[in-house]
Amino acid sequence: MVSKNTGHRCSFCGRSDKEVQLMITGIDGYICNECVERANEICQDALKTVSQSKLGLDLKTLPKPQDIKTFLDQYVIGQDEAKRYLSVAVYNHYKRLLQKTGDDEVELEKSNIIMVGATGTGKTLLARTIAKFLSVPFTIVDATVLTEAGYVGEDIESILTRLLQVADYDVKAAERGIVFIDEIDKIARKGDNPSITRDVSGEGVQQGLLKLLEGSVVNVPPQGGRKHPEQRMIPVDTKNILFICGGAFDGIERKIAQRLNTHVVGYHAVENTAKVDKDNMMQYIAPQDLKAFGLIPEIIGRMPILTYLNPLDRTALRNILTEPKNSITKQYIKLFEMDGVKLSFDDDVLEYVVDKAIEFKLGARGLRSIVEAIMMDVMFDLPSSKKKTFTVTLDYAKSQLEKANISRLQNS
């Protein structure tokens, strides 16, 4: 019951009903509207603290951007610019989750991320490594399988289904997770696609992604698949889910060049337009280039952090083979060690692998495919033999790669 001008005082703050707007009457006491508002704030902060403690989030222990980048350096070679952007973005995102309910009415907005870079430059690895560092639910989604409602393929909500599955259906944990949407460039708007069996232009999928990126409560089918009326749904609030999108955006260099009024090739190539580095046009990428490529403005606006990944040069590819904590060569050495065999690689073998990765234009992702082809026979035969050491020589590597289906690697 609400009372007014009865002479009653708030049992919490002692104010009379004449000093406040409302006085709520209970069985054995009274509470004013101001104490109700304050109690609501205390409850919200307490519930947020409980949820954060379950996920190990605390402002004092939250890794700083330099700590995040140092961890990334252990697993990802190069790409310092992208690492810095990601480290700051992730740090600010989780500070936002730790924000207390205050009176200043300053609400920190979510900053989703889009990474542009050629295949094999480390987009997926960066996102996966950050999720590993923070120990939060993480899932990778291929944008090419997503379709708008009514077409064959996966619904947009399947993204959240996968995140829920990774989080063991802990909704609170999933609502603070990270989603990496790969191949985001493949759903760019295209007007010349005649298909009638799926989303024709890609714009429908982009429109469907908007509600996830901006933050809204989405009803998710727990086991995935299409929705039907009698199915039980799980409501998931996406406002605190960090979305990282990645794509190769093949051909976007021409869009950048057009904007900079610089031709990439041709008789009209400009020698020097504001000292533009035409060998790495990606460093000049801007949101308007993504729009020209086919992403709708609403999608671009909900991914305010745009960063690029440089093409990997020979030195970077060589370091990827040996330097990271879980480098390719270290993984094979560990596998052989489990069989009691000491494995080693000659230096010229590693140079040969890099040569082939560059020749096939596979980037870092192709390094493993090449090494796997070289190592297949010895991994099959050695466990049954009594050998305790094995050295991969250049002649052996060449012979094994010639036996392998090289065209398959080149076309992968």
Where in the sequence are the language-model features?
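AAA+ P-loop NTPase nucleotide-binding core of proteostasis motors
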Residues: V2-E34, E41-G78, K83-T139, A143-V152, ...
